[in-house]
């Protein structure tokens, strides 16, 4: 049996009627969320401030919006600028969730969580998973990090932050605009205006269409794919190698259609296989009855490495943002650098 992932209710985004039970529960969720936030704002509950800068990359909707590609790009930029970044994450869906853990590139995703393992695999920086992000930040500082990047955690108010980056999907935005469970919102849409940076994930949009899709004060993020890395090891192939071929495309992410569309844009014949987000794969899940190449996202690949073979490929995703975004971010961060 395949491990179950998380499915997004269709009525969050497709305009279909919201069940009455969900409508009745949404105000309760909204009230609890507002009360908790007010408690931190008014000092009834205390923030904890770490002695190094803290950057939170998050969203106000449930599910994926492109936070992890941005986190990876951010870590690489910070390292190039002379910082020693570390990443703190909750590690959604992992086993022994109450147990803090250092995540390595070879940590099983069941133990470390999909996104933390992917970040460790791609960047090599210290990655700490812990329900308590304050404790995770302290551990990263002890490990020598001088800036903390939180992958998700916009709503984890106990940890004070210096920079907030909201990531929103350009296609789905805020869905039906309702709070969980009637809609995708963790917090009201107005919360987004309080973030220091709003990044709009445009997928494979080009520079011209990116500029048109983003409003004032929003930064476009384009996603690019160029190659495919065999899971069994060996030299990567350019995606042009698969042009004109049929392939099985596997995506267990929040918005799998985006991955399929990106492959099709490269002239690849896609046989799509959409799985739930955070799917725990078993070998039989990828037995499609043919020897066509299997191309998958890197988030899926880290969960399939144990049974990878010569025709399973991970397709690296690269996030690209305007140079002005990085200038604005590093300028803000440099002001926080200790003398």
UniProtKB/Swiss-Prot annotation:
* InterPro entries documented for this protein: LpxK, P-loop_NTPase
Any one GO BP annotation for this protein? lipid A biosynthetic process
Superkingdom: Bacteria
Q: Which residues bind ATP?
A: 61-68
Q: A single Gene Ontology molecular function, please?
A: tetraacyldisaccharide 4'-kinase activity
Question: GO cellular component annotations, sorted alphabetically?
Answer: plasma membrane
Q: Which UniProt keywords apply?
A: ATP-binding, Kinase, Lipid A biosynthesis, Lipid biosynthesis, Lipid metabolism, Nucleotide-binding, Transferase
The answer to whether UniProt assigns keyword ATP-binding to this entry is yes
UniProt enzyme class: transferase
* Enzyme Commission code(s) on record: 2.7.1.130
Please name the pathway.
Glycolipid biosynthesis; lipid IV(A) biosynthesis; lipid IV(A) from (3R)-3-hydroxytetradecanoyl-[acyl-carrier-protein] and UDP-N-acetyl-alpha-D-glucosamine: step 6/6
Q: Which Pfam families match?
A: LpxK
Catalytic reaction annotation: a lipid A disaccharide + ATP = a lipid IVA + ADP + H(+)
Q: Which family does it belong to?
A: Belongs to the LpxK family.
Which HAMAP family does the protein's record reference?
A: LpxK
Q: What does this protein's UniProt record list under function?
A: Transfers the gamma-phosphate of ATP to the 4'-position of a tetraacyldisaccharide 1-phosphate intermediate (termed DS-1-P) to form tetraacyldisaccharide 1,4'-bis-phosphate (lipid IVA).
User: What's the protein name?
Assistant: Tetraacyldisaccharide 4'-kinase
Gene field: lpxK
